[in-house]
């Protein structure tokens, strides 16, 4: 069975979106071939994704995890029972209120591959429950000053072990193991 990991692109000051929940700042980023190589290596081993309820809106607007380059099951947290959505060869399954259940379903669907956690709230909840094995961050050379923090409000100390770090012209890529 693969790892459960947080995967996020964030600014140097720790934000994954601006104060309006927008990630438009990502449109101006310039990645190098080496950056794409690192991202593709991570994405290639993802077998399922767990995201928050906010992802439902972005999916309805056309966004898909990993740009649709890989087809995988997606499990989205919600407070309201919702039928699965089939879109562009991917199945979006909605799980009501139980993040541990969503992660277990994603692990079963992923088989030997990894499960990626996308979004700040989901990431913090999974860290608190001890469900996260690794954290993979792509840090952009940008300061937003305010916005939605990836780890803000976590409320506890989580010890990490650095697995890998690489830096190219555009991004710094960091991978950490969560010490349990």
Which residues fall in each region the model found?
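Enzymes that bind and transform nitrogen-containing heteroaromatic metabolites
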Residues: 1-180
